[in-house]
C-alpha cells in the first residue's frame, strides 16, 4: 500500500496544472462562502444586537392636544377694595373640548383649577393689586397647563398603559453650527424603548430632571403657603430631602443659612428660620433653565442664589458613524471614568474649573457649549442615521448625532429655544395593528390632528410624511436581505461548479493513468486498494484549498464590510479565526473530494485488466464521433478526422459547452446591465427634470370651494382679483392712520376689539386669514381679560412647524436689525445668552402696543402702536419685493453670516420671505409655479387619488404645457425618446392615460389596456358622505402611451379628464381654476408656512368638532340666532353673518332652516362627516426629486457593487475551468499528435486539427447562451423590480453577444499557445518507444 501511495505522489507531478486548478476552485468556493456568509452573519448580528439590546420601537405616536388659550378673567363680584383675595375663572372661550373632557373625567381636580383663588398679599394700592391679578392669571394658566400635560387619564400615555405597551418620549433638537448639522437626542440609561447601545466607553448617567421637578413642586408648595407659615408647613410635610438639597448646594459662605437648614433637617420645630424664610419670600424665584435649578432671593438689598446643578448634563455619547470621522480629527473617548466621577461630586465652581482643565480632545462642542465624550453608541432608531426630511442621505462629516440625558439636552435647548425639534412617543405595542387602530380611534376624539394625518402609525410606515423612523430603520434590513440573497446564490453556484469540475479532473487523471492501473491490477492488487491510494490526489487540493480559503474568508471580512461603508454605520465585529471552523470546512471538503474520488475510481476500476490495457494502447473513437464523421463523407480525410476529434469526448464537450455558455451568459449579463441603472435613472430624471418638488394638496369639496392662493412673498396682501371663486375675502379691518394696512387686508395683526368679537361670534373668523408671529404674539388686556391670538394659532400647528415659526421669527428680527440697525432697535430688543454669546431677539411690547388708559394703570393694551404698525407693514412690503428674487439668491441666505442678508437687500431692496405664515384656505406659491397667471397657477394640476387592484394609486391630471421655456411640468417620452405628452390631449372618445414602465410592468399594462379606478377625492365626496352614500367615483381609462421613467408606478392623464372625473363645476374649466397639486423649485410653501384647509367650508377659531367643544357650540348657536332674528337690527344686516349661516347649512347638508334645539345634532354631523376636525393640513405630501434621485442612486450603487463582486468572482472561475478542461481534452489526444508528427504534419496543423473541438463548442455555446442570456437578463430585471420598484430595460444586444464570444475566444487562445509549446518539446522516437 505504501508503494502505491508513493507511486501516486510521483505521478502528481505530471498533473500539476490540474491540481493547481482544483486547489484554486476549492479555495474560491470555501473562501467565498466563508467571506460572504460571515459578512451577512456579522451584519445581522450587529443589527440584531442593536435592535434587540436597544429595544427598537414598532410604533410612533405624535401628540397634539388643544389646551386652548388658557385665559383667565377675574370674577366680576370680587370687591377689590374690601376683600383680601380674588377669584380667577377660565373664560368660556378657553374651555376647549379637551378641558371639558378633563372636567368630566376628574371634576374634583379640574374644578379647582378652572376656578382659582389668590391673595392680594396685603396690598392696598390699585396698581399693585392689578399687577398681582395679572401675575396670578399667568400662574393659574400654568397650574392648569401643568395638570393637563401630565394627566395620564387625558393623554395618550394612559391609553398606552391600558394596552400594556412599553413607551417613552423621543425628543431631539437640530442645530446648525458653522455649516455643520448637529442633532442632540435625549437618552436616559433606563429607557425601555430605543435605548442607547454602547460600543465604547460608558453609558450616560441618569439625569436629575425628575429630582428637579420634585424640588420645584415642593418649593412651590412651601412658597404658596407663605413664608410666615414656614414652621407649620415643614412640620406637616416630608421636606427633609428638600432641605438637605438646599444645604448641600448652598455656598460655604452662607454659614448662617446652612446652620439654620441643618437644624431644620434634624428638628422641624426649630425656631431659627429667619434666613430660611427669605428663600420663600414673594420676590424669590426658582427657575429650571440650562439643566440647572437657580434659586434667587433678596437679602438686605443683595441678590443671592443657590444653584442646584446636574454634572451628568455635561456628558455625551457620539454616534459611531460620526466617531469614525471625529477620530480622524484627533478626538478620543475620555478614558479615566473614575476621575470623572470624582469631578462630578465637586461643588459647581470647582466642577466647572476642573471641567475646563480636561483636554479639548475629549470634548465636542455644540455652538460653544462643551460636552465630555464618555462613550460611543447608537440607538436602534438611528441605525441608518437620516438627519432630517430634507437630508435623507447620511453624511458623517456634516451631519452629526450626539446623545445626552434630559438635563444635558436642557443645557443646549435653553439657548436654542427657536430651533427645530423632533418630538414623539415611541412605543413597543404587543398587538401592533389592533393597538394602532385603538389609539387612532381614541386620537380622533382627543387630539387635534388633521384627518389626513394619523396620530399613531407603524415605525415602518413609509407612507406617513411625519415618519422619519422608517427611513432610519427600513433600509438596513433590505440591505442585509439583498446581500444574503446574493451570498446564497453565489455560494451554491461556486460549490456546484467546483464539484462538477472536480469530477471531470479526477476522471481525466484516472484515465491518464490507465496503463499503471492495469499493470497494478494484473499484479494482483485489488481495485479497492488502488482506489484508496488515489484518495491522496483529492486530499492535497482539499486540505490546501480549504485552509487557504477559510483563512482568506476570515482575513478579508473588513474589506467586505468597508464595501458597504456608505450605507453601514453600525460597528460590526468580525468573526475570529476558529480551529473548529477550519476543521469543519477542511473535513467537509475532504469528505466531498474523497467521495468523488472513490465513486469515479470504483467505476473505472471495475473494468477487466485486459480491457483496460487494450483500451489504453489504442485511440478509440466514440460513437458520436463516428456518427458525426458520416455527415461529412464527401469531404477530405483530414476534415472527417477533425470532425471525429471534435465529437470524440461527448460528455466533456457537453460540460465545456455548458461552461462556455455560462461564461457568455454572465458576460452578456455584465455587458447588458453595465449602464442599465444609469439609463433608468436618466430616463426617470428626464420626466422630472424641470422641477425639484411636487406638492400634493387637500382636494376641494362643494362645501370648501376652491383653495385660494397668492404669491408666497405676497401672502396676506389685499387680493385685487375679480374672479369670485379664487379671490380672498379681504375682510380684515384697516388700521387708522396707517395707510399701508389697506394693502394687507388678509394679513391679521393684533386688534383686541375686532379679534375678541370675531373669535366669539364669527363662525368663519379664520377664513382666508394669513397670520404670523410678528403680527399676533402680543398679550392684549381689557377689563381684566388678557388675550394672545398667537397661542391659539400655535395649537393648530404641528410641533415642528410651530418650532419652525419661532426659528423664522428670530431670523426675521435678526435680518431687520442687520439691514437697518437704527430703525430696528427702536422696536426690537436684543439680549445675549451669557453661555453661547448668541443674541435672542424679541419685539419690545411696550413700544409696539398702544396703552389706551395710561392714567389709571389698568394696562388696556388694545391695538398696535401706529408707529410700530407702520414699521411692521414696511417689513411686509420689503418681503413682498422678494417675489422677484431668484431661488439661487434665496437659497444663498446664511443667517450665521449677516453679509448674505445685506447682499440680498442691496440687490433687491428687499428682505427674504422670512416671516413664517399660518394661513387658512390660502396657500403661498413660488413665482415659478404661478408663472404670471392671475386666476390659476400655471403649473398647478389635478391629482386623482384612487385604488386599482387593491392598491392605492395616484393619477396626475397635467396641463398641456407646450412652451419649453421655464416649463416645470413632466416630460413624458417613449422608448424611442419621443415626447408623448401630446398623446393625452388628442380628441378621444375615452379617457386617456399614460403610464410609466414601472406601472406597465407591475399591472401588466400595454398601449390599449383599460383600467378601472375607484377615485376617492372627488369634489362631491362630502355630499355623498353626508347622506351615507359611497363617496367613490368609478372611472375607466385607456392607456395611450408608456413613459420611460423607471422608478415606482406613475400615471398621467389630461387636466380636462381629471377635471371631469373629479366632478368640478363646468364654469371653472375655462380658466382651469381647480388644482390640488403643483410643481415647484422651492420648499417655501412648506418650510416657511403652514396652510390649513377646511373641507367643511367653515373656519371657526377652534381645533375640533365635538359636542364637548363649548366654543363651537356657542358659535353655531349665534349663527342660527342670526337667522331667527334674535340679534339686533344692525347685526342682522351684516352680509357676512348671512354668508356664515349659508355655509353652515352647506357643511351640514341641510337646506331647510336650522333649529337652535338641534345644535348638538349639528355638531355630531360635523364630527362624523369631517372626522372630528375642522382643518386638514393643506399640504399632504411632498415629492423631493433630489431625494428620490439619491434614494435611486443608493439602491443602484449597492446593487451594482454586489453584482460586480459576484461577476468578478464567477468569471475567473469559469474561465479557469474552460482553460483547464479544454487543455485536458487536448492532452488526451497526445498519442495521436505523436503519430501525426511522425507522418510529417507540423505542430500548427496538428493543433489546428485539435482545435476543431472548439467549433461545436462555439456553435452550441451560442445556441445555448443566447436564449438563456435573454432569460437571465430578464430575471435580473425582474429581481431588481421586485426588490426596489426600479424598472430596468436591460437586453441582449448583438454587440454584447459578439463581445462575450471574443472574450471566450481570448481565453481559449491561451490553450492554443500552451499546447503549441508542449508539442514543440515532443521527441518522436522517445514518445513512440514509451508508448
From Swiss-Prot:
Write down the species.
Mycoplasma genitalium (strain ATCC 33530 / DSM 19775 / NCTC 10195 / G37)
Q: How does it sit in the membrane?
A: Multi-pass membrane protein
Q: What is the lineage of its organism?
A: Bacteria, Bacillati, Mycoplasmatota, Mycoplasmoidales, Mycoplasmoidaceae
Protein family according to the UniProt entry: Belongs to the ABC-4 integral membrane protein family.
User: Where is it found, in Gene Ontology cellular component terms?
Assistant: plasma membrane
Q: Does the keyword Oxidoreductase apply?
A: no
Q: Which residues cross the membrane?
A: 373-393, 487-507, 534-554, 579-599, 653-673, 1206-1226, 1255-1275, 1297-1317
Main localisation, per the record? membrane
InterPro entries noted in UniProt: ABC3_permease_C, Macrolide_Exporter_MacB
Q: Which Pfam families match?
A: FtsX (PF02687)
Domain of life of the organism in this record?
Answer: Bacteria
Q: Where in the cell is it found?
A: Cell membrane
Q: Which protein are we looking at? A: Uncharacterized ABC transporter permease MG064
**Could you tell me the keywords of this UniProt record?**
Cell membrane, Membrane, Transmembrane, Transmembrane helix, Transport
> What is an example of a GO molecular function annotated in this UniProt entry?
transmembrane transporter activity
Amino acid at each position: 500500500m505504501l508503494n502505491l501511495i508513493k507511486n501516486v505522489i510521483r505521478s502528481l507531478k505530471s498533473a500539476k496544472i490540474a491540481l493547481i486548478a482544483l486547489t484554486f476552485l476549492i479555495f474560491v468556493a470555501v473562501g467565498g462562502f466563508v467571506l460572504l456568509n460571515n459578512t451577512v452573519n456579522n451584519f445581522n448580528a450587529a443589527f440584531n444586537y442593536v435592535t434587540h439590546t436597544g429595544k427598537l420601537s414598532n410604533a410612533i405616536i405624535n401628540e397634539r392636544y388643544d389646551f386652548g388659550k388658557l385665559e383667565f378673567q377675574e370674577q366680576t363680584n370680587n370687591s377689590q377694595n374690601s376683600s383680601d383675595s380674588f377669584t380667577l375663572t377660565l373664560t368660556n372661550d378657553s374651555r376647549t373640548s379637551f378641558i371639558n373632557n378633563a372636567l368630566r373625567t376628574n371634576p374634583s381636580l379640574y374644578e379647582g383649577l378652572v376656578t382659582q383663588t389668590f391673595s392680594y398679599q396685603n396690598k392696598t394700592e390699585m396698581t399693585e393689586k392689578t399687577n398681582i391679578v395679572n401675575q396670578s392669571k399667568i400662574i393659574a394658566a400654568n397650574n392648569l397647563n401643568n395638570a393637563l400635560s401630565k394627566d395620564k387619564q387625558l393623554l395618550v400615555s394612559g391609553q398606552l398603559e391600558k394596552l400594556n405597551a412599553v413607551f417613552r418620549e423621543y425628543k431631539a433638537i437640530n442645530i446648525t453650527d458653522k455649516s455643520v448639522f448637529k442633532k442632540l437626542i435625549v437618552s436616559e440609561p433606563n429607557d425601555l424603548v430605543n435605548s442607547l447601545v454602547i460600543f465604547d466607553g460608558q453609558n450616560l448617567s441618569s439625569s436629575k430632571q425628575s429630582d428637579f421637578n420634585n424640588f420645584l413642586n415642593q418649593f412651590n408648595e412651601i412658597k404658596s403657603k407663605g413664608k410666615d407659615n414656614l414652621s407649620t408647613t415643614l412640620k406637616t410635610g416630608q421636606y427633609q430631602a428638600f432641605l438637605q438639597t438646599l444645604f448641600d448646594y448652598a455656598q460655604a459662605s452662607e454659614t448662617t443659612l446652612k446652620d439654620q437648614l441643618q437644624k431644620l433637617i434634624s428638628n422641624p420645630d426649630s425656631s431659627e428660620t429667619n434666613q430660611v424664610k427669605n428663600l420663600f419670600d414673594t420676590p424669590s424665584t426658582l427657575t429650571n433653565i440650562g439643566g440647572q435649578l437657580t434659586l434667587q432671593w433678596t437679602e438686605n438689598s443683595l441678590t443671592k442664589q443657590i444653584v442646584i446643578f446636574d454634572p451628568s448634563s455635561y456628558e455625551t455619547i457620539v454616534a459611531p458613524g460620526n466617531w469614525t470621522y471625529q477620530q480622524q480629527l484627533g478626538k478620543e473617548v475620555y478614558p479615566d471614568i473614575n476621575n470623572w466621577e470624582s469631578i462630578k461630586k465637586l461643588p459647581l465652581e470647582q466642577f466647572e474649573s476642573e471641567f475646563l482643565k480636561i483636554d479639548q480632545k475629549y470634548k465636542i462642542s455644540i455652538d460653544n457649549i462643551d460636552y465630555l465624550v464618555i462613550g460611543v453608541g447608537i440607538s436602534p432608531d438611528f441605525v441608518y442615521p437620516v438627519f432630517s426630511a430634507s437630508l435623507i442621505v447620511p453624511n458623517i462629516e456634516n451631519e452629526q448625532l450626539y446623545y445626552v440625558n434630559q438635563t444635558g439636552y436642557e443645557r443646549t435647548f435653553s439657548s436654542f429655544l427657536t430651533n427645530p425639534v423632533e418630538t414623539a412617543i415611541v412605543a413597543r405595542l404587543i398587538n401592533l395593528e389592533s393597538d394602532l387602530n385603538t389609539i387612532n380611534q381614541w386620537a380622533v376624539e382627543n387630539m387635534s390632528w388633521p384627518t389626513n394625518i394619523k396620530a399613531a402609525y407603524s415605525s415602518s410606515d413609509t407612507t406617513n410624511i411625519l415618519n422619519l423612523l422608517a427611513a432610519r430603520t427600513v433600509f438596513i434590513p433590505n440591505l442585509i436581505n439583498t446581500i444574503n440573497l446574493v451570498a446564497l446564490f453565489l455560494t451554491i453556484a461556486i460549490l456546484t461548479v467546483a464539484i462538477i469540475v472536480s469530477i471531470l479532473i479526477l476522471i481525466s487523471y484516472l484515465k491518464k493513468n490507465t496503463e499503471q492501473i492495469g499493470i497494478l491490477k494484473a499484479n494482483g492488487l485489488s481495485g479497492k486498494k488502488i482506489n484508496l491510494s488515489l484518495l491522496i490526489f483529492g486530499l492535497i487540493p482539499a486540505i490546501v484549498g480549504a485552509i487557504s480559503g477559510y483563512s482568506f474568508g476570515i482575513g478579508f471580512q473588513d474589506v467586505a464590510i468597508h464595501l458597504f461603508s456608505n450605507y453601514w454605520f453600525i460597528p460590526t465585529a468580525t468573526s475570529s479565526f476558529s480551529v473548529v471552523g477550519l476543521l469543519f470546512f477542511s473535513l467537509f471538503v475532504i469528505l466531498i473530494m474523497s467521495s468523488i474520488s472513490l465513486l469515479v475510481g470504483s467505476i473505472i476500476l471495475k473494468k477487466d485488466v485486459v480491457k483496460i490495457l487494450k483500451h489504453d494502447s489504442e485511440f478509440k473513437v466514440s460513437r458520436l464521433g463516428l456518427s458525426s464523421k458520416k455527415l461529412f463523407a464527401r469531404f477530405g480525410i483530414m476534415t472527417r478526422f477533425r470532425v471525429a476529434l471534435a465529437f470524440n469526448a461527448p460528455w466533456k464537450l457537453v460540460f465545456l459547452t455548458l461552461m462556455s455558455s455560462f461564461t457568455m451568459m454572465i458576460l452578456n449579463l455584465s455587458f447588458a446591465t453595465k449602464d442599465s441603472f444609469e439609463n433608468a435613472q436618466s430616463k426617470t430624471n428626464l420626466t422630472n427634470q424641470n422641477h425639484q418638488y411636487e406638492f400634493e394638496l387637500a382636494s376641494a369639496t362643494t362645501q370648501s370651494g376652491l383653495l385660494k392662493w397668492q404669491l408666497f412673498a405676497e401672502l396676506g396682501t389685499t387680493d385685487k382679483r375679480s374672479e369670485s371663486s379664487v379671490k380672498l375675502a379681504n375682510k380684515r379691518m384697516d388700521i387708522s392712520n396707517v395707510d399701508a394696512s389697506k394693502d394687507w387686508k388678509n394679513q391679521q395683526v393684533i386688534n383686541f376689539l375686532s379679534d375678541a368679537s370675531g373669535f366669539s361670534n364669527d363662525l368663519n373668523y379664520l377664513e382666508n386669514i394669513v397670520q404670523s408671529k410678528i403680527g399676533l404674539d402680543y398679550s392684549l388686556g381689557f377689563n381684566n381679560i388678557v388675550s394672545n391670538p398667537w397661542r391659539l394659532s400655535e395649537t393648530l400647528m404641528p410641533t415642528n412647524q410651530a418650532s419652525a415659526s419661532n426659528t423664522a421669527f428670530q431670523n426675521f428680527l435678526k435680518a431687520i436689525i442687520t439691514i437697518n440697525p437704527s430703525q430696528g432697535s427702536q422696536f426690537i430688543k436684543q439680549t445675549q445668552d451669557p453661555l453661547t454669546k448668541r443674541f435672542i431677539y424679541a419685539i419690545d411690547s411696550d413700544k409696539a402696543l398702544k396703552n389706551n388708559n395710561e392714567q389709571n394703570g389698568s394696562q388696556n393694551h388694545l391695538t398696535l402702536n401706529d408707529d410700530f404698525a407702520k414699521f411692521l407693514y414696511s417689513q411686509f412690503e420689503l418681503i413682498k419685493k422678494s417675489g422677484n428674487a431668484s431661488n439661487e439668491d434665496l437659497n444663498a441666505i446664511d443667517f450665521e453670516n449677516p453679509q448674505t442678508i445685506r447682499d440680498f437687500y442691496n440687490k433687491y431692496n428687499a428682505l427674504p420671505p422670512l416671516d413664517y405664515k399660518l394661513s387658512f384656505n390660502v396657500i403661498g406659491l413660488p413665482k415659478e409655479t404661478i408663472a404670471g397667471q392671475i386666476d390659476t397657477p400655471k403649473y398647478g394640476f389635478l391629482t386623482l387619488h384612487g385604488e386599482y387592484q387593491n392598491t392605492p394609486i395616484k393619477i396626475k391630471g397635467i396641463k398641456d404645457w407646450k412652451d419649453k421655456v421655464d416649463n416645470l411640468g413632466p416630460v413624458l417620452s417613449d422608448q424611442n425618446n419621443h415626447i408623448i405628452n401630446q398623446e393625452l390631449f388628442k380628441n378621444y372618445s375615452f379617457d386617456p392615460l399614460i403610464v410609466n414602465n414601472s406601472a406597465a410592468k407591475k399591472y401588466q399594462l400595454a398601449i390599449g389596456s383599460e383600467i378601472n379606478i375607484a377615485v376617492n377625492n372627488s369634489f362631491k365626496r362630502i355630499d355623498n358622505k353626508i347622506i351615507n352614500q359611497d363617496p367613490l367615483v368609478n372611472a375607466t381609462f385607456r392607456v395611450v402611451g408608456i413613459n420611460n421613467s423607471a422608478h415606482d408606478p406613475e400615471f398621467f392623464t389630461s387636466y380636462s379628464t381629471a377635471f371631469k372625473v373629479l366632478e368640478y363645476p363646468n364654469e371653472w374649466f375655462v380658466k382651469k381654476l381647480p388644482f390640488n397639486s403643483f410643481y415647484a423649485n422651492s420648499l417655501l410653501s412648506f418650510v416657511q408656512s403652514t396652510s390649513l384647509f377646511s373641507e367643511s367650508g367653515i373656519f371657526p377659531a377652534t381645533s375640533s368638532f365635538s359636542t364637548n367643544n363649548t366654543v363651537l357650540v356657542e358659535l353655531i348657536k349665534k349663527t342660527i340666532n342670526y337667522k331667527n332674528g334674535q340679534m339686533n337690527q344692525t347685526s342682522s344686516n351684516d352680509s357676512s353673518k348671512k354668508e356664515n349661516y349659508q355655509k353652515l347649512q352647506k357643511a351640514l347638508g341641510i337646506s331647510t332652516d336650522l333649529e337652535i334645539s338641534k345644535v348638538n345634532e349639528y355638531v355630531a354631523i360635523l364630527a362624523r362627516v369631517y372626522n372630528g376636525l375642522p382643518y386638514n393640513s393643506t399640504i399632504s405630501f411632498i415629492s423631493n426629486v433630489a431625494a428620490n434621485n439619491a434614494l435611486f442612486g443608493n439602491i443602484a450603487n449597492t446593487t451594482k457593487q454586489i453584482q460586480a463582486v459576484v461577476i468578478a468572482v464567477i468569471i475567473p472561475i469559469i474561465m479557469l475551468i474552460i482553460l483547464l478542461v479544454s487543455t485536458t481534452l487536448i492532452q488526451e489526444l497526445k498519442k495521436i499528435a505523436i503519430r501525426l508528427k511522425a507522418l510529417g504534419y507540423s505542430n500548427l496543423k496538428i493543433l489546428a486539427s485539435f482545435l476543431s473541438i472548439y467549433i461545436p463548442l462555439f456553435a452550441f455555446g451560442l445556441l445555448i447562451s443566447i436564449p438563456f442570456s435573454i432569460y437571465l437578463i430578464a430575471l435580473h430585471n425582474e429581481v431588481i423590480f421586485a426588490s426596489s420598484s426600479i424598472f430596468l430595460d436591460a437586453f441582449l444586444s448583438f454587440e454584447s453577444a459578439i463581445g462575450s464570444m471574443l472574450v471566450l475566444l481570448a481565453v481559449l487562445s491561451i490553450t492554443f499557445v500552451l499546447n503549441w509549446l508542449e508539442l514543440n518539446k515532443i521527441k518522436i522516437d522517445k514518445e513512440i518507444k514509451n508508448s
